[in-house]
Amino acid sequence: MATVALLRSLRRRELHAAHISAYKFSSASAGGRTTELRLHGVKDIIAVASGKGGVGKSSTAVNLAVALANKCELKIGLLDADVYGPSVPIMMNINQKPQVNQDMKMIPVENYGVKCMSMGLLVEKDAPLVWRGPMVMSALAKMTKGVDWGDLDILVVDMPPGTGDAQISISQNLKLSGAVIVSTPQDVALADANRGISMFDKVRVPILGLVENMSCFVCPHCNEPSFIFGKEGARRTAAKKGLKLIGEIPLEMSIREGSDEGVPVVVSSPGSIVSKAYQDLAQNVVKGLKELRENPDNEIQMKLNVPHSSHSS
């Protein structure tokens, strides 16, 4: 079976980790990027990242990808690079093993107009991935170069949370066009978001902007906002860093329900306020990538404008 052969290959590669030069991290290369994993037919690759777990990075990546495909009418792929905690199969309602084409490349599983690949599709459900770094890097190589992505406008990469070796290696070896940093408004999450910003700066990946997830909770009875995790923390952080806030996503039960049921909220409730927030985020990402192409020297600061949320005052 192709997926079994893949996992055996990964184990062999772990034993020969010294030969995985494409993913070998060197502090001397921190100032530049390699092109080892440039993907044929993929115009742009963007990372959706967070400095810590639990801030809604994966739900943001999923709804952003679906909004890019359906609202912006683009050809989109979604790579679940969160190897230790893959959640894309559940959120996108995909559970079938990927097929292998005549070139021995895996064919991504498609749903909601998005081509998806995840380690969660290749291992048994609930099976723990007790892997060391080289094996993780080898797996990610298989899920990029070993996949027939076809022609894509954007490949959205759901990054592992944090700023460790895996995140740095992915950022260096995938030809990232830009990164989106997801955070909640509270100080502890923003401190970790700052570390993520610094990491992408060091590996010279342009930052498209920050997304403030769980920005507020709007009472369904009185329509009054409650700023449970703080107010406008990501906006202030973006301003201090000279970046832009490109999305504000409210705390809403429909996001959680959609994630658990495998129906992204932009599909289940396309006219809702929260879906509009994801659609605005998608449009801002497209604008940011367009600006980078037109102004390649302007790698960090995106001239985007996100109006204050109607619940911010």
From Swiss-Prot:
Binding site for ATP: G51, K52, G53, G54, V55, G56, K57, S58
Main localization (coarse): mitochondrion
Cofactor note: Binds 1 [4Fe-4S] cluster.
UniProt GO molecular function: 4 iron, 4 sulfur cluster binding; ATP binding; ATP-dependent FeS chaperone activity; metal ion binding
GO biological process: iron-sulfur cluster assembly; mitochondrial respiratory chain complex I assembly; mitochondrial translation
Any one cellular-component term (Gene Ontology): mitochondrion
CC cofactor: [4Fe-4S] cluster
Compartments it resides in: Mitochondrion matrix
PANTHER family for the chain: IRON-SULFUR PROTEIN NUBPL
Family according to the record: Belongs to the Mrp/NBP35 ATP-binding proteins family.
Stated name of the protein: Iron-sulfur protein required for NADH dehydrogenase, mitochondrial
Record organism: Arabidopsis thaliana
The organism's taxonomic lineage, starting at the top: Eukaryota, Viridiplantae, Streptophyta, Embryophyta, Tracheophyta
